């Protein structure tokens, strides 16, 4: 093992030797003697700590040698001190513990060392053992009594051993968890925590049986300066987030329709924010991290629990950032922009790793495919492009042909289908289509009445239902499998800007130019077949 070094965290130097000592103490307290010995030998670092120095030294003072030798076996003391300690077994001879003395004299390492290096001293012990008798007054040097000899040993031991509180490793970990709770990094109601991964164990959240949303549940009012430009439910089902015109990112409790009180930074009016309007929001798969893109060309990455900005890309593009997606392992972010390009950014390096150029207008949406070896994008130029994620080469462009009836008009969004990832749900202005990426053919279409333009659309979590809003602010609900229209009604008085479905509940959030955010729920008495 290499020599331990020190590590500096926020100007506090942490010695690696101290970390090893914490582990040594843990091994000792949990009776893992073999591991304790192996780690001490490999690192050359010794614990030399006792639970209670006072108790240990009192055992020496009172001649409780069974307790003393048990503790000493876990320490790394100097050879001189060990020989002095083991020599004190003459007291056991005085108590006629002959067999024990014989074992200690002939089988222990300190006395074997004495035999090889201080023969006269060793033979003195051996001779007394053979006679099975000892006069301690004759054995000690002139004027030394048993009590004085024990006092000398106590002084020697006092210089080589230390005492530390028990369970230091667990205590420090506990303090760390309490601090993270105080900072909002760990939820207050958290009862389990994976120390190794540094996260709350993932628990699968049971999804409600999917039903269409028809009933207005909550309404949140904004004004023209702070109205949301984008909204999204978190994948861990906890929050609804809004990104607003004034640059604020707010985390809402969708059950109450109010700002979440579980996040300390929001309670202190310390919000996540940009200097300009927020255009897009994306979550990491586990919901721990948030990426936001703004009109002033910037991307910021946040930890939702603490509200801290972890990474900035300034600028990320030469124009506003319109769409974002995390890679599956949350180490990269894919972005699209008004500047017609896409980029992959590295969260560790803080740099753009790849750039994709080829669209002739705004990039409106982008995503990785399932294997993350392809990037898929759509644009206001009416084209869908499929890119090689490593080389940045455009591998395929889906454009109108005599076979493909997708019109050469703005494509607002794309969604990969769960059951068949070779197909895309494509939201065009005039219709919503299911398009094969291989054949570039349309297998199904969804249209509004009187060919009204679609503004936004989203799928239910299991992709049983398609929700789409047209320019008259009518919400259309389609059976995604059959294509039949199940319901339609007006949801806003002005243009709908953004839409998001809850990942496990029958909740749909919408926001519009009327400065309202509305949350819709299902009515369990609805007969969706009517």
From Swiss-Prot:
CDD domains attached to this UniProt entry: WD40
Pfam families, sorted: LisH_TPL, WD40
PROSITE patterns per the UniProt record, alphabetical: LISH (PS50896), WD_REPEATS_1 (PS00678), WD_REPEATS_2 (PS50082), WD_REPEATS_REGION (PS50294)
GO biological process, alphabetically ordered: mRNA splicing, via spliceosome; RNA splicing
Keyword Isomerase: no
Positions annotated as WD repeat: 223-262, 273-314, 316-357, 358-397, 449-490, 491-530
Family: Belongs to the WD repeat SMU1 family.
Protein name: WD40 repeat-containing protein smu1
């Amino acid at each position: 093992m290499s020599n331990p070094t020190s590590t500096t965290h926020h100007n506090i130097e942490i010695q690696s030797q101290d970390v090893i000592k914490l582990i040594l103490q843990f091994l000792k307290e949990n009776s893992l003697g073999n591991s304790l010995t192996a780690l001490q030998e490999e690192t050359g670092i010794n614990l030399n700590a006792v639970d209670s120095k006072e108790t240990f030294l009192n055992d020496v003072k009172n001649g409780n040698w069974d307790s003393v030798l048990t503790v000493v076996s876990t320490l790394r003391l100097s050879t001189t001190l060990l020989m002095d300690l083991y020599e004190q077994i003459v007291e056991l001879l005085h108590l006629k513990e002959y067999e024990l003395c014989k074992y200690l004299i002939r089988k222990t390492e300190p006395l074997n060392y004495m035999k090889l290096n201080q023969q006269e001293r060793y033979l003195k012990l051996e001779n007394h053992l053979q006679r099975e008798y000892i006069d301690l007054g004759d054995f000690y040097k002139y004027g030394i009594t048993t009590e004085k000899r024990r006092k000398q040993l106590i002084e020697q031991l006092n210089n080589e051993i230390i005492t530390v509180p028990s369970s230091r490793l667990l205590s420090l970990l506990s303090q760390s968890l309490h601090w993270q709770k105080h900072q909002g990094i760990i939820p207050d109601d958290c009862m389990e925590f994976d120390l190794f991964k540094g996260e709350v164990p993932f628990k699968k959240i049971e999804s409600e049986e999917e039903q269409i949303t028809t009933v207005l549940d909550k309404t949140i009012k904004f004004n023209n300066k702070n109205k949301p430009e984008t909204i999204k439910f978190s994948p861990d089902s906890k929050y609804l987030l809004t990104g607003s015109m004034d640059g604020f990112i707010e985390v809402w409790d969708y059950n109450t329709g109010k700002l979440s009180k579980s996040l300390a930074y929001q309670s202190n009016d310390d919000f996540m924010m940009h200097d300009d309007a927020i255009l897009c929001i994306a979550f990491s798969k586990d919901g721990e991290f948030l990426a936001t893109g703004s009109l002033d060309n910037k991307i910021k990455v946040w930890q939702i629990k603490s509200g801290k900005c972890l990474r900035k890309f300034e600028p990320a593009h030469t124009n506003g950032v319109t769409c974002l997606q995390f890679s599956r392992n949350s180490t990269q972010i894919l972005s699209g922009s008004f500047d017609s390009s896409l980029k992959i950014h590295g969260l560790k390096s803080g740099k753009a790793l790849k750039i994709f150029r080829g669209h002739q207008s705004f990039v409106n949406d982008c995503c990785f495919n399932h294997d993350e070896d392809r990037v898929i994008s759509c644009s206001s130029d009416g084209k869908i492009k499929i890119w090689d994620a490593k080389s940045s080469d455009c591998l395929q462009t889906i454009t109108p042909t005599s076979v493909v009836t997708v019109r050469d008009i703005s494509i607002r969004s794309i969604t990969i289908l769960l059951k068949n990832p070779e197909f895309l749900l494509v939201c065009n202005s005039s219709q919503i289509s299911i398009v094969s990426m291989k054949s570039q053919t349309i297998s199904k279409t969804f249209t509004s009445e009187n060919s009204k333009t679609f503004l936004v659309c989203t799928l239910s979590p299991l992709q049983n239902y398609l929700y789409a809003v047209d320019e008259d602010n009518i919400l259309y609900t389609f059976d995604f499998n059959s294509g039949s229209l199940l319901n339609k009604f007006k949801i806003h008085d002005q243009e709908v800007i953004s839409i998001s479905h809850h990942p496990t509940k029958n909740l749909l959030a919408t926001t519009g130019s009327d400065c309202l955010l509305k949350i819709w729920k299902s009515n369990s008495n609805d007969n969706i077949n009517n």
